[in-house]
Amino acid sequence: MKDMGRKARRAATVLAVMSSEQKNKALEMIALSLEAHSDEILRANHQDLLNATQNNLTVAMVDRLKLNEVRLCTIIDSVRQVACLPDPVGQVMDEWTRPNGLHISRVRTPLGVIGIIYESRPNVTIDASTLCLKAGNAAILRGGSDSFHSAHALHCALVKGLKKAGFPKDAIQMVATKDRGAVGEMLKGLDGAIDVIVPRGGKNLVARIQVDARVPIFAHLEGLCHIYIDQSADLDMARNIVLNAKLRRTGICSAVETVLIDRQALEKFLPILTALQKKGCEIRATEDIVFLMPDAKLAFEEDWSHEYLDAIVSVKTVESVEGAIAHIKRYSSGHTESIIAEDMEIVEKFFNHLDSAILLHNASTQFADGGEFGFGAEIGIATGKMHARGPIGVEQLTSFQYHIKGNGQVRP
């Protein structure tokens, strides 16, 4: 593992000075290599899916793991989208001239070596690698055992693309073992080789990393997203948004887990809950809702803080936007919250009083995604308050330097 760290550090010094044209060529070579090896990648994924069935993984977990031609094409498209993004390295973030004539610029620079620890999503292999590459960083990947074959097939194709572009193969390395001890070694930083760790996985994985990491991390513990439906909301709009936010893909961190409804308009919005039930979604709700919907289950305290990642949703009535804000402040993970309302004063209050990384108005929580933000792809979502917050794209994978130019100044 420490040898991987040394190799990554050497590769990072090469990547840091690569031109935009060189990096974009490498990304195109990676896309072409993924296309050329798509059959091998899908066969490897099929093996992971067979193992998942034998290991009794949930439907949501299998969906996270699954690749098909459409999803693989989406991954390949995302590589080309990253190539089209502006190169952050060398961008002047700000500049000014001091009274003594010194000209000071704050300039974006690569972070160095990024450690990516993830579980069952094969696409993270490519998303993380290409974003790191675009930002001039080397990466060390450690995928989960569920996606072991898929991740390695994707990485193999990626490295072939790197070689064709003349890039060091050690720019993107993958830990070739399922041994969990490798994660512990990465969390120690590999003797100073790793600059940042980005975890992408379940609550237990991220919690362990947050406790054990000896290097900085960009992470969120869980999704636990909320939608508040105000009495001023349009019923049809609210129904479409809630159905999408819950059921488009239930197993992703931006899926809504709790819906809060303005108590004064409960009967107006009951058709939303009926529509969810018709789609096979289980409703766990407060007593006033269960009274009107006998098929719904009574919610318990633990439901408000539970990330289901399944076709289950908690529903609660609240006294206006103030009640929604109070509930979200108590239970939110700080990931994503949405308000459906036509009253802009209510919307402004919602936005001004909540501190989650992403706030939406009249839109599905499932837009909490780097691709939807125009970032091309994302490594993950960060809910901390450092410079990387929300979707982690190429800009968030950079640091900065101060470049100071003078003409002989000395300090008095």
From Swiss-Prot:
UniProt cross-references to InterPro entries, sorted A to Z: Ald_DH/histidinol_DH, Ald_DH_C, Ald_DH_N, Aldehyde_DH_dom, G-glutamylP_reductase_CS, Glu-5-SA_DH, GPR_dom
Broad EC category: oxidoreductase
GO process terms (BP): L-proline biosynthetic process
Recorded metabolic or biological pathway in which this protein acts: Amino-acid biosynthesis; L-proline biosynthesis; L-glutamate 5-semialdehyde from L-glutamate: step 2/2
Catalytic function, reaction form: L-glutamate 5-semialdehyde + phosphate + NADP(+) = L-glutamyl 5-phosphate + NADPH + H(+)
EC number: 1.2.1.41
Highest taxon, organism lineage: Bacteria
Alphabetically ordered keywords of this record: Amino-acid biosynthesis, Cytoplasm, NADP, Oxidoreductase, Proline biosynthesis
Annotated GO MF terms: glutamate-5-semialdehyde dehydrogenase activity; NADP binding
Any matching Pfam family: Aldedh
Cellular compartment(s): Cytoplasm
UniProt-listed SUPFAM superfamilies: ALDH-like
One GO term describing the cellular component: cytoplasm
Main location: cytoplasm
Family: Belongs to the gamma-glutamyl phosphate reductase family.
Task performed by this protein: Catalyzes the NADPH-dependent reduction of L-glutamate 5-phosphate into L-glutamate 5-semialdehyde and phosphate. The product spontaneously undergoes cyclization to form 1-pyrroline-5-carboxylate.
PANTHER family registered for this protein in UniProt: DELTA-1-PYRROLINE-5-CARBOXYLATE SYNTHASE, GLUTAMATE SEMIALDEHYDE DEHYDROGENASE
Protein name in UniProt: Gamma-glutamyl phosphate reductase
Native source organism of the sequence: Bartonella henselae (strain ATCC 49882 / DSM 28221 / CCUG 30454 / Houston 1)
Gene that this sequence comes from: proA
